[in-house]
Amino acid sequence: MWRPSIINGGNVQEQLTKPPQAKMSSKLIMPFVNSTINVFTTMAKIKPELSAPHLKTDAHTTYDVSGIIGFSGEILGSVVVSFQLETAKKLVNALVGMEVDPDSSDFTDAIGELANMIAGNAKKDLGLLANIGLPAVVIGAGHVIGRLSGVPCVVIPCHTSVGDFAVEVNIKPA
């Protein structure tokens, strides 16, 4: 199993043992950290580095493209993987091995599949009976993504050689 490396002067595992404002267990976050690194390293051959997680305070995103997967069963909520458009294009091209038009269904399918792989691998590692929904993809600057109310949304900032992205985890045990 992958163990987080030293990032920004600290260990991601140590940073997650005290999640932002201690409102979400690191046991719910670490599967998404591990899955993100595994999916990007294996599928796109791009290794992300992670910064300290933090709480998201509003529903607006600062990104242009988001892949969203809902959870049901013993875990409720969603995971969102968001990118700037240029970063998303480079990642999709690396994933499929050719240039993909961002206005095509192949582009949205690839973004949805990245979100699906991250959610699916994390679901397995959570060890709970959970279902994941079909991916939804939203494209547009400043889009808004609905969240479970009363449940913290933890943002995991990720940095790669092709640009930055974020994984947002908004889940709770049922």
Tell me what each language-model feature is:
Residues 2-174:
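N-terminal auxiliary interaction/assembly segments of multi-subunit proteins
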